[in-house]
Amino acid sequence: MEATSHPAVHPVAVPPQFQGAGPPAIQMKDFPGSPGTAGGLALRFTQFGFSLISLCIMVSIAGFSSVTAFCFLVATMVFQCIWSLCLGALDIYALLTQRSFRNPLIVSLFVVGDWVTSTMTFAGACAAAGITVLIDNDLEQCGPNHCGRFEAAAAMAFMSWTATTLSFCLSFWLLASCR
């Protein structure tokens, strides 16, 4: 007795039409918060807002430039503001033209940029928080210094770092899903 097989997939009357020589290319999925989406734009403006608040707080303190860690925080916040504003403009362009960033080369640029700015922001926030703890707890010289403002600037930098790290993770996930 001969065994017969029954196909699991029923035949299609007309085969699908391919444009080009091979099967269709694999498309990247749009995750909420990925570049070129409304969530991505919200993340960019969140990064920009927190870093701008941190920058304004630090610049409003008269003697911040005498401490290297505070100067580094200001430099990283300037860099974070520029990066977030530029990518926010790209997100606005993508939303207005109804395009998305599905090119792996462009997404990898976002991934590397978010990774670098995230690392710099975290380092600046940690350095500023460490010096603030030193001034407040160890030296007990918080009276003449502006510890509350230093703490607020470091907290805003940490919030900016959180948004940048989330953006990095989503962009990295988008990049990994296309391969």
Curated annotation (Swiss-Prot):
This protein's record includes keyword Membrane: yes
Segments forming a coiled coil: none
InterPro entries xref list: CASP_dom (IPR006702), CASPL-5 (IPR045009)
Cytoplasmic domain ranges by topology: 1-54, 97-114, 176-179
Membrane topology value: Multi-pass membrane protein
UniProt subcellular location: Cell membrane
Cystine residue pairs: none
Keyword Transmembrane part of the UniProt annotation: yes
Signal peptide, first to last residue: none
Ranges annotated as spanning the membrane: 55-75, 76-96, 115-135, 155-175
GO cellular component entries: membrane; plasma membrane
Main location: membrane
Keywords in alphabetical order: Cell membrane, Membrane, Transmembrane, Transmembrane helix
Ranges facing Extracellular side: 136-154
Superkingdom of origin organism: Eukaryota
Pfam families in UniProt: CASP_dom
Family, per entry: Belongs to the Casparian strip membrane proteins (CASP) family.
Subunit-structure text: Homodimer and heterodimers.
Name this protein carries in UniProt: CASP-like protein 5A2
Origin organism lineage: Eukaryota, Viridiplantae, Streptophyta, Embryophyta, Bryophyta
